[in-house]
């Protein structure tokens, strides 16, 4: 069993999150159509620095992520530094942990702060499902390499003659797990069947997510954490997420057919996250550095945990695995939390994790723990809606959740909050946040 692990520097400074910002999230091929992730990243980091009024030289490191990477910009972090007017000497590197990428970016900056190598940094992520690295078939790729080595026109023509029409078809990015061939939706279907989660339960959670997200926007709760953007042809501002269905009814969800298991499935496009474009980032500092600069932190990073499980069956159980570890490291229990924000990749996945957090059997037989993590209080859970409503630009979701949770904690007078997510490859992430 792990013990509480205080996240502080050698001088006893807490890790402060002083501000956070994101672009509005856009459904694939809508408001951000044609804008690559690196440009979305530049948008949000540039605006974050402008709003914070922090001198560029104060930021000593930028860790950024992108899941669907573009070959022409393999280090999105460095491109953001070079494209936003930041100090050219700012250290910058990129990370990828699938849907938990910006969780990892935040953890990396926090570790640099604790090590004392920096006193302030930026973490975040961006993804575009509208600008994708469309590839070629393996056969064509191999022949193109061989053609480059061929010496004569005859040799080149002979190589090209081996190709068939099907070899010339473009190859979009894979939507399946590399190691298993399973799509994420296939795993969600597995989980629905394993844990007895009905179509009605999934649709109800999705409807709840959209209703709460719509209410959050209507009440102005997201205005300070979402920037206004202008995308080509620069005629209209884009300032609110365009996936939220505030006027939908439960009956609307019931009309959709299963998207993965066509005959017996329960996972639909409406109770899953859509493909989305967007970016998000946060500024982290040591507590003393924030005080020197006269900054009031949004909150503090209390603990974090990353876990991994097998990918063949029910692999999206990351929250059920990582949450108890993060709570233990924070010296807290689930009951101590004021808010719980869980990434909604699919309604089925979300409901399965909620079920297992309260399962004594899962805790004992799978996690090797004496007691269940705890029953999730609905009044604390995804109170502003979740990814099913907002959308899910893979690398940006974690930073969105962190910023959103800290703002809501402050509105409620402070306390502790949990942000947690599943990720491809059987990975899981959880962070405990604190606001005063």
UniProtKB/Swiss-Prot annotation:
Its EC number is 2.3.1.16. Pfam families: Thiolase_C (PF02803), Thiolase_N (PF00108). GO terms for cellular component: cytosol. One of its GO terms (molecular function) is acetyl-CoA C-acyltransferase activity. Keywords: Acyltransferase, Cytoplasm, Fatty acid metabolism, Lipid degradation, Lipid metabolism, Transferase. It catalyses: an acyl-CoA + acetyl-CoA = a 3-oxoacyl-CoA + CoA. PROSITE patterns: THIOLASE_1 (PS00098), THIOLASE_2 (PS00737), THIOLASE_3 (PS00099). Its main location: cytoplasm. It comes from the Bacteria. Belongs to the thiolase-like superfamily. Thiolase family. PANTHER family: ACETYL-COA ACETYLTRANSFERASE, CYTOSOLIC, ACETYL-COA C-ACYLTRANSFERASE. This is 3-ketoacyl-CoA thiolase. The gene is fadI.
């Amino acid at each position: 069993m792990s013990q509480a692990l205080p996240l502080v520097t050698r001088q006893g400074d807490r890790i402060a999150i002083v501000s956070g910002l994101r672009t509005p999230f856009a459904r694939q091929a809508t408001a951000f159509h044609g804008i690559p992730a690196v440009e979305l990243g530049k948008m949000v980091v540039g605006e974050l620095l402008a709003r914070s009024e922090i001198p560029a030289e104060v930021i000593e490191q930028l860790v950024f992520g992108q899941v669907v990477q573009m070959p022409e910009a393999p280090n999105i972090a460095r491109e953001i530094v070079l494209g936003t007017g930041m100090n050219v000497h700012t250290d910058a590197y990129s990370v990828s942990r699938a849907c938990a990428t910006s969780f990892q970016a935040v953890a990396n900056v926090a570790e640099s702060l604790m090590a004392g190598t920096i006193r302030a940094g930026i973490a975040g992520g961006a993804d575009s499902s509208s600008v994708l690295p469309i590839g070629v078939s393996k056969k064509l790729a191999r022949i193109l390499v061989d053609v480059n080595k061929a010496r004569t026109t005859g040799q080149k023509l002979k190589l090209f003659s081996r190709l068939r029409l099907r070899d010339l078809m473009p190859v979009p990015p894979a939507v399946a797990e590399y190691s298993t061939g399973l799509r994420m939706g296939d795993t969600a279907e597995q989980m629905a069947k394993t844990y007895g989660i009905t179509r009605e339960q999934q649709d109800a959670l999705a409807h709840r997510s959209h209703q709460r997200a719509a209410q959050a926007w209507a009440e102005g709760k997201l205005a300070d954490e979402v920037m206004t953007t202008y995308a080509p042809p620069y005629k209209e501002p884009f300032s609110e997420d365009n996936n939220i269905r505030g006027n939908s009814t439960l009956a609307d969800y019931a009309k959709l057919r299963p998207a993965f298991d066509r005959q017996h499935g329960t996972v639909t496009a409406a109770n899953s996250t859509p493909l989305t474009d967007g970016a998000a980032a946060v500024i982290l500092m040591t507590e003393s550095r924030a005080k020197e600069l006269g900054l009031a932190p949004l909150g503090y990073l209390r603990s974090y945990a990353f876990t991994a499980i097998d990918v063949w069956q029910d692999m999206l159980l990351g929250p059920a695995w990582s949450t108890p570890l993060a709570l233990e490291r924070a010296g807290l229990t689930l009951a101590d939390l004021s808010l719980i924000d869980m990434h909604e990749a699919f309604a089925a996945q979300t409901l399965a994790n909620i079920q297992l957090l309260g399962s004594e059997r899962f805790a004992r037989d799978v996690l090797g723990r004496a007691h269940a993590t705890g029953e999730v209080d609905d009044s604390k859970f995804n109170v502003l809606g979740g990814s099913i409503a907002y959308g899910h630009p893979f690398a940006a979701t974690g930073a969105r959740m962190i910023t959103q949770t800290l703002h809501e904690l402050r509105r409620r007078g402070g306390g502790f909050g949990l942000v947690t997510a599943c990720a491809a490859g059987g990975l899981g992430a959880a962070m405990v946040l604190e606001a005063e």
